[in-house]
Design a protein with these regions (language model features):
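Outer-membrane beta-barrel biogenesis signature
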Residues: 8-45, 49, 187, 229
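Repeated loop/turn-to-beta-strand initiation elements of outer-membrane beta-barrel proteins
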Residues: 40-41, 68-74, 103-108, 148-153, ...
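Transmembrane beta-strands of outer-membrane beta-barrel pores
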Residues: 46-50, 76-82, 100, 114-120, ...
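Residues that define the transmembrane beta-barrel architecture of outer-membrane proteins
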Residues: 54-58, 86-92, 130-136, 161, ...
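Membrane-embedded beta-strands of outer-membrane beta-barrel proteins
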Residues: 60, 94-96, 138-140, 177-179, ...
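Residue-level signature of outer-membrane beta-barrel architecture
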Residues: 64, 98-100, 142-146, 181-183, ...
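Outer-membrane beta-barrel "beta-signal"
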Residues: 93-96, 100, 225-227, 252-265
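Detector for outer-membrane/organellar transmembrane beta-barrel domains
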Residues: 127-207
Length: 265
């Protein structure tokens, strides 16, 4: 169990509803991006790892600006190994984001989401009762744009359990803390980067397996190219460092790499 937390840790670059949202007219992978009222957007991402290049994951987030402050989105992810020798439908989620402040370059967003995973595990059934977990998340982000540089920090709490509404059970709790940067080089090119820590607040996970402050640091850097204000393409690399017990940190083998495409209309 704890599938969603583990999958989002292992493929954090593909995380459904990472707590990033910007009120820029252009879609450009700025961590503060938010669609204007009446605008749709799509973010498509593919990723792999240098130590497992026969395995690929893909994610899609499709959203809509209900107002200039409120946006809704659905997201899903899938993965495959050895040219679809094995594959599964990982996650499906629904999220809301609300901008509570936009003043003097400062922006504050509140987010909430609900997700399930795996939706269709390999050799399993749809929403498999023995494998599928359900995740509720709330979060906040604070960011500021200073000329060509945007900086943003976020915090989020996740609650994962074996059913959607069995909140009386212990479940599995995680916290995510992170920071992102976006540097505009010119009208077309931009550099992006970010770090995030994902850790559990529990000493036991599903099945009563004991853990001690288990968590993962991930870091990413990338470059984006804007075709116009309504579309961009980007490439990135990332590395993770994790621990299973206090004081026992190790850098994960290999590095993540992938590409991203965004469009609004």
């Amino acid at each position: 169990k704890g599938y969603i937390m583990k999958k989002l840790t292992l493929t954090s670059l593909m995380a459904v509803f990472a707590v990033s949202a910007a009120n820029a007219a252009a879609i450009n992978d700025n961590p503060l991006y938010r669609p204007d009222q009446g605008k749709f957007y799509s973010m498509t991402e593919v990723a792999s790892n240098s130590k497992a290049t026969t395995s690929w994951a893909a994610a899609e987030e499709f959203g809509y600006g209900i107002t200039d402050k409120l946006a809704i989105a659905v997201a899903t992810s899938v993965n495959e190994t050895d040219w679809f020798d094995s594959s599964d439908w990982d996650t499906m989620g629904l999220g809301l984001s609300y901008r509570v402040m936009d003043m003097n370059g400062w922006m504050v967003d509140l987010t909430g989401s609900y997700g399930v995973g795996p939706v269709m595990p390999y050799k399993g059934s749809f929403l498999d009762k023995d494998l599928t977990d359900y995740q509720w998340s709330i979060g906040a982000q604070v960011g500021k744009t200073m000329g060509n540089l945007t900086l943003a920090g976020h915090v989020a709490m996740d609650y994962v359990n074996s059913e959607s509404f069995n909140w009386n059970d212990d479940g599995w709790h995680t916290v995510r803390l992170g920071a992102d940067a976006f540097l505009t080089l010119n009208d077309n090119w931009a550099l992006v980067g970010g770090v995030e820590y994902t850790g559990t607040t529990d000493d036991k996970m599903f099945g009563k397996v004991k853990v001690e402050n288990a968590g993962t640091w991930t870091g990413t850097v990338g470059v984006n190219y804007n075709f116009c204000e309504n579309s961009f393409v980007g490439a990135y690399v990332g590395r993770a460092m994790s621990h299973k017990a206090a004081g026992e940190w190790s850098t994960d083998a290999g590095f993540a790499f992938g590409g991203k495409f965004g469009i609004q209309f």
